[in-house]
């Protein structure tokens, strides 16, 4: 076993036909499940496979195949020696500002590619960010992903109830409103906060308390973020239209990484974190 998530377990396996290691995602099916519910889960996994396969990006794990056996689907994917950002923080503690900014820029690059393809990730969090041994950064687990156009046309999934990790759900999702591109960016902001501070800004003793903290914008100002402070605070704004755009975020992440590399680095002025239209 190389990973576990809310939807399934990822196993390391060997492809005898092509002589290569692969990762195989097994879906967790509840013990008592109706046929209709099983179909929903299978459809979600198929959606994940299609969403991932549609993205030609170095920050996305390649999908090799989708197999259905005894009514249960499995995704066969590229295997990479890696560990999650969550695991890295748990083992080594908070990241430095420069490294966090670089990882954030890589995750943002995947999100921009996904958004350009009409796909929302909807579950950006440290456990879904993988750091490979060669330094490559990947955004994985598109299990809650939805295609924006198809979701709106079908009238489903975009308002599919509250799913995901409560501490990384943006306010509009907690309120049961549709996901937006800005929703993924908010979750990126919460992930960056966790990377530099070592804990989630909205994690509380139970899920409802976490969601209430999200709705109230109740989090402590980051103390270790340095030059990332305006990025984090700009992404965690309550209203989607007030958040930093992807373009502004990319620019500020580059500036933060450059500034953090200099001796005596300090945070950029908060005024620099302006919301953008894109």
Model region roles, listed by residue range:
Residues 28-54:
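AlphaC helix of the eukaryotic protein kinase fold
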Residues 107-119:
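Protein kinase catalytic-loop region centered on the HRD/HxD motif
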Residues 103-104:
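Activation segment signature within eukaryotic-like protein kinase domains
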Residues 66:
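Activation-segment/catalytic-loop signature of the eukaryotic protein kinase fold
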Residues 1-6, 10:
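Protein kinase glycine-rich loop
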Residues 70-84, 88:
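Conserved short submotifs of the Hanks-type protein kinase catalytic core
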């Amino acid at each position: 076993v190389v990973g576990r998530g809310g939807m399934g377990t990822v196993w390391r396996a060997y492809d005898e036909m092509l002589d290569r290691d692969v990762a195989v995602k097994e879906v967790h099916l509840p013990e008592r499940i109706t046929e209709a519910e099983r179909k929903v889960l299978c459809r979600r996994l198929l959606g994940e496979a299609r969403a991932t396969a549609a993205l030609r990006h170095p920050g996305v794990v390649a999908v090799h195949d989708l197999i259905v056996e005894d009514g249960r689907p499995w995704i066969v994917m590229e295997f990479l020696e890696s560990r999650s950002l969550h695991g890295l923080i748990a083992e080594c503690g908070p990241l430095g500002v420069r490294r966090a900014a670089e990882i954030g820029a890589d995750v943002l690059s995947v999100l921009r590619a996904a958004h350009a393809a009409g796909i929302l990730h909807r579950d950006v969090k440290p456990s879904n960010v993988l750091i490979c041994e060669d330094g490559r950064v990947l955004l994985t687990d598109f299990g809650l992903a939805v295609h924006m156009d198809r979701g709106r046309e079908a009238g489903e999934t975009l308002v599919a109830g509250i799913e995901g990790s409560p501490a990384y759900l943006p306010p509009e999702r907690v309120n049961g409103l549709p996901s937006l591109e800005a929703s993924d960016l908010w979750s990126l902001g919460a992930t960056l906060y966790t990377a530099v501070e070592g804990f989630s800004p909205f994690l509380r003793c139970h899920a409802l308390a976490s969601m209430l903290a999200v709705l109230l914008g109740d989090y402590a100002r980051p103390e270790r973020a340095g030059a990332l402070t305006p990025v984090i605070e700009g992404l965690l704004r309550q209203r989607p239209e007030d958040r930093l755009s992807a373009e502004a975020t990319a620019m500020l992440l580059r500036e933060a990484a450059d500034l953090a590399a200099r001796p005596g680095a300090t945070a950029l002025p908060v005024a620099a974190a302006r919301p953008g239209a894109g």
